[in-house]
Amino acid sequence: MYSILIACSAAVAVCLSSWRLADAVWGWALLWGALAFLGAMFSVNYLVRKRITAVMAGMQALLADGQKEMQARVNAFQNRPTGDPKRIMAEMEKFQKKLLTQALEHTMKLEPFCKWTLLFSRQLNTTLMQFHYQMQDFKKVDELMPRCLILDPMSGAMKMARQHVNKAPVEEIEKTFFKAKARLKYNQSVLLYSLMAWIFLKNDMPDKAHALLVKGCKDNENETLNRNRDRLANNKVREFNNANLGDEWFALFLEQPKIQMRRQQPRLDGRPF
């Protein structure tokens, strides 16, 4: 890492200079060397993170503008449902893929900083993995996953989803769940609990799914968790549904959303439009 090399060079230079000026008193020389190391590390990391923040801000702005445009198209179709819903869905997926490709290209501007900041390469791999996941490039996702930092609910859920699709043992997926959940605070693990319960049901383990949701309702305040817990308690396994989690759930591509079309209100002047 360049930042460590620069800090070490500064520390050695200051240490040797202090030793000569202090008549071979190594204690003071080492102290000034340590302070030089910390000062150099702070300065370099501050400048690098400032550049990283600027690139990330540009990427977030790009995604925000794209999401607004995509939501406007969806709302327009729901308010005035003309055309084939499947064609509209295909157009939305095409637009989203184009947007993610642009964001991915923008993110690659961060690659040079991997040599400057400790662990940043793993953070960047996590961001790249999430973009490739949304583009459904799962081969690349599986390639990047071992080099990612699983620190947020979505990246943890993505890892669990890939393990499920790749037919990993349930015990292995459960380990990923507990590891990802351990870092989260109250009301942050809804997606992880919902996904793990769904995986239990897919493996014919309704009792484990119900027990998990009971714990999940203690760690979170969420209507979907409560509803699914009650359904499993009443043996209504077929009514288990995570659709109310919205985009977070469907972003895992384990289930497909349904386009809901709003009924148009008739005009009072008798004109059809």
Predicted features along the sequence, with ranges:
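Helical anchoring/docking segments at protein termini
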Residues: M1-G58, K258-F273
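N-terminal topogenic membrane-targeting module
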Residues: V25-N125
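Residue-level recognition of tetratricopeptide repeat
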Residues: Q60, Q130, A161-R162, W198-I199, ...
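Hydrophobic/aromatic side-chain positions at a characteristic register within alpha-helices
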Residues: L63, M92-F95, Y133, H164-V165, ...
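Alpha-helical repeat scaffolds
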Residues: T101-L110, F138-R147, P169-L184, P206-G216, ...
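Long, non-transmembrane cytosolic or organellar matrix-exposed soluble domains/tails
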Residues: R183-F273
